Amino acid sequence: MSILVKNNIHWVGQRDWEVRDFHGTEYKTLRGSSYNSYLIREEKNVLIDTVDHKFSREFVQNLRSEIDLADIDYIIINHAEEDHAGALTELMAQIPDTPIYCTANAIDSITGHHHHPEWNFNVVKTGDTLDIGNGKQLIFVETPMLHWPDSMMTYMTGDAVLFSNDAFGQHYCDERLFNDEVDQTELFEQCQRYYANILTPFSRLVTPKITEILGFNLPVDMIATSHGVVWRDNPTQIVELYLKWAADYQEDRITIFYDTMSNNTRMMADAIAQGINEVDPNVAVKIFNVARSDKNEILTNVFRSKGVLVGTSTMNNVMMPKIAGLVEEMTGLRFRNKRASAFGSHGWSGGAVDRLSTRLQDAGFEMSLSLKAKWRPDIDALELCRQHGRDIARQWALAPLPETNVKATTQEEECACAAAAAADLGPSMQCSVCQWIYDPAKGEPLQDVAPGTPWSDVPDNFLCPECSLGKDVFDVLATEAK
């Protein structure tokens, strides 16, 4: 089976309706995928890429029905990964001397996967051309680390088609090939999901590479990707989206995700979200339980967000395994221009929230104060969670927010705060390690230190909520020192 792309270019790839895991289990392909291979018939016959190795036999059989394999003059491999070049062994068994054009790095990868160093490799670099007859040429553009070292794109003059490799693609299987034929909302979602989960680590390379390609001043009538649709209707729309996504992208959105053992951390997540929306009803807030949610949807939402709140219960003094794994993936994705805060519940001892805060900071997030609750949050602890959400909403606001008056939850709390404010409670104290501030008027309810407790009356076993160090590391807050 083949599909006419344009003039003498046909799609000869393979749809994969059933695939649900990609790159091991790193990427959930909930809408399947396709492996796009293209056959060009000019004076010279050119095959661009193959398909995933599991479809090798079907691919060669289908290709044979389109063309005598011996008539293929050149094979172009834009990318050596197995979902692109996987059928090479099956194909080259039939036409072993056919020239293969690829980057130098691709030769290393292809021979590493297929173990045929004797194949007729021809190295190409940016700006190299290959004459295919009828006044047309292929122009090669290296795109290293988008997303492998061997990656390149191929441009066909005359027809003005850019064979873009993984860039501008999506794991999206449909019986229709072109972007104007499919559901536009689904297509946009899958494009963004693909960029967020695969190309985000290389965003710093995207803009200069697109700028380099545009600098050739070549018309682009179509973008033929390696996965998903071919962009024939306004193909530059996806290029414009990539330029936007590569520029430290964020929306007015906050993502909250958590894992919980006894529902306590979930209660905290809900209360924090309530506090955020009290202060800023316009910010989009989405909550995920990592044990019940699609991991790649969570990461896509993190990509879209200005900030993320991550919650975990404490298990053996460390964070929950699913949270640890997801934070490790976030580290690899190298998100930029994002803020973060950790929260969670614990029992007799903690540890997870501090560990999580450190990991998020190591992942490149700008950190805000964390929040902890001991055992199941009661009405007072949940109010602290809501207040944390209010504080986060103001700290992370993209524009100044109007002041709002939030009622105290109980009359007793109002009295306590008023009394604390009126009393001479002595100075606030600041942790010399993590800079957390103890305010005597507020106390530290999570350690049973009531509002209005002077520092001298704070128990000796008090621990800094942020770094878990004792009272001896605290100094008088500099602004209050006399």
From Swiss-Prot:
Q: Which GO terms fall under molecular function for this chain's record?
A: electron transfer activity; FMN binding; iron ion binding; nitric oxide reductase activity
Which keywords has UniProt assigned to this entry? Answer: Cytoplasm, Electron transport, Flavoprotein, FMN, Iron, Metal-binding, Oxidoreductase, Transport
Could you say which cofactors this protein requires? Answer: Fe cation; FMN
Keyword Ribonucleoprotein in the entry? The reply is: no
Q: How is the cofactor bound?
A: Binds 3 Fe cations per monomer.
Q: Which residues form the Flavodoxin-like domain?
A: 254-393
Enumerate the InterPro entries for this protein: Anaer_NO_rdtase_flvorubredoxin, Flavodoxin/NO_synth, Flavoprotein-like_sf, Metallo-B-lactamas, ODP_dom, RibonucZ/Hydroxyglut_hydro, Rubredoxin-like_dom, Rubredoxin-O_OxRdtase
Residues reported in the UniProt entry to bind Fe cation 3 = 431, 434, 464, 467
Query: Record's superkingdom?
Result: Bacteria
Q: Which GO cellular component terms are attached?
A: cytoplasm
Alphabetical list of CDD domains matching this protein = flavodiiron_proteins_MBL-fold, rubredoxin
Q: Which family does it belong to?
A: In the N-terminal section; belongs to the zinc metallo-hydrolase group 3 family.
HAMAP family per the record? NorV
The job of this chain, per UniProt, is described as: Anaerobic nitric oxide reductase; uses NADH to detoxify nitric oxide (NO), protecting several 4Fe-4S NO-sensitive enzymes. Has at least 2 reductase partners, only one of which (NorW, flavorubredoxin reductase) has been identified. NO probably binds to the di-iron center; electrons enter from the NorW at rubredoxin and are transferred sequentially to the FMN center and the di-iron center. Also able to function as an aerobic oxygen reductase.
The subunit structure is: Homotetramer.
> Which protein, by its recorded name, is this?
Anaerobic nitric oxide reductase flavorubredoxin
